[in-house]
Amino acid sequence: MTENTESPQSVATDIPEHKRRIKSFVLRQGRLSQAQQNAIDTMWPQYGLTLEDKLLDFNTLFGREAPTIIEIGFGMGNSLAAMAEAHPENNYIGIEVHRPGVGALLKLVAEKGLTNVRVFNEDAIEVLNRQIPKNSLSAVYLFFPDPWHKTKHKKRRILQAEFAEKIAQYLAPGGQFHMATDWEDYALHMMSVMSAAKGYRNISGEGQYTPRPDYRPLTKFEQRGHRLGHGVWDLVFERI
């Protein structure tokens, strides 16, 4: 996810708590391409999910019993589509607030003929709170979230202690929370938060980062970064 340089909105105190929560994103009104709009028009009825106050039944949703994985903030959907294509044995639910990314993913779903992907165009916290059963997920992926690198904005980083403990509630025992970032300061923050969070173990050992697992696609951005000597840090913590 690219760096966000917009100023965060002020937080009001006279509105409900779920609306006062400091959000990790600023909703930008990006323009959809015609192809993205067409994909939403044609694919959303089958693959799109609308936020409700009702827990999902994954077996009914996907028409089968299979491990279910959520990716939070899938960007333009390239990695999620690649994983779903490479691992048809898994179910994938993508959550993204930016509509062009939703359109881009649905376009890939159509092109690849994927049937194991469903999509929310919503705030991930709201989806978790209202629709995901506890102890149900095989994995949660958080790849390249906004680093909010300015000191005054770091409180907006999605990975905080409360969020880490929330994710643990939705993972099945043995389920994994996999994070990746290309900002070293955020990698250190992630390691600090996750090492202190209850209910997890670092699969690579205390304080250790994990080599990129084969299932996480190497992005074009990463490939360019590697050529320039830039680092990428993966962390994988298992619910115990």
Curated annotation (Swiss-Prot):
One of its GO terms (cellular component) is tRNA methyltransferase complex. Keywords: Methyltransferase, S-adenosyl-L-methionine, Transferase, tRNA processing. Its EC number is 2.1.1.33. One of its GO terms (molecular function) is tRNA (guanine(46)-N7)-methyltransferase activity. The active site is at residue 146. It is an enzyme of class 2 (transferase). Pathway: tRNA modification; N(7)-methylguanine-tRNA biosynthesis. It catalyses: guanosine(46) in tRNA + S-adenosyl-L-methionine = N(7)-methylguanosine(46) in tRNA + S-adenosyl-L-homocysteine. Belongs to the class I-like SAM-binding methyltransferase superfamily. TrmB family. HAMAP family: tRNA_methyltr_TrmB (MF_01057). This is tRNA (guanine-N(7)-)-methyltransferase. The gene is trmB.
